[in-house]
Amino acid sequence: MSLGNQITNSSTAYEMAGQRALQNRCLIVAAAGNHRQPPPPDTVGQPANSPSIMAVAAVDNQLRLAPFSCGSGSVAGSKVDIAGPGVAVYSSVPMPARYAVFNGTSMATPHVAGVAALWSQATGAKGFQLWHQLTSHARPLSLPVSDVGSGLVQTV
């Protein structure tokens, strides 16, 4: 999901949707947000700050934290769970241009969602079990867990 705002309090509606999705063996993956401004860094915004929704941070091709990627906060649920490529990502745009390069946690999120689909297809995992597989198989990074969660998403 590529929605975002700078509201640090979690939303009851988003949390209920995340819980219902997990109960029905579905996983919602959302961008952590692009409004990091030290000090202290701005934290994960809605809907990714809901405990039942997986929050995705962005890293570059050198596995450095993207300077815009929000980090974990002290509010319940406002934590980064995993990271994906989110800097200089080649993506489609309307004609006539066809393609362009973008940065953002909204570029990292489809990487995580795509890998989740591969894990689900290969193992049959769904919902919370899929969440656990993604985070337990992520590549640890030499960055704070508060910024990248369990690390870089990995394929099967």
Question: Residue spans of the language-model regions?
Answer:
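C-terminal subdomain of the subtilisin-like protease fold in secreted/lumenal serine endopeptidases
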Residues: M1, N24-C26, S52-A55, P67, ...
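Short acidic, glycine-rich surface-loop motifs adjacent to enzyme active sites
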Residues: M1-A13, R25, A31-A32
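Soluble non-cytosolic domains of exported or imported proteins
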Residues: T8, T12, F102, S106-P110, ...
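Charged helix-capping and loop-helix junction motifs
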Residues: S11-M16, P41
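Surface-exposed amphipathic alpha-helices with a cationic face
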Residues: E15-L22, S120
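Extracellular S/T/G-rich loop segment that most often corresponds to the catalytic His/Ser-adjacent loop
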Residues: C26, G45-Q121, L152-T155
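Active-site environment of divalent metal-dependent phosphoester hydrolases
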Residues: H35-P40
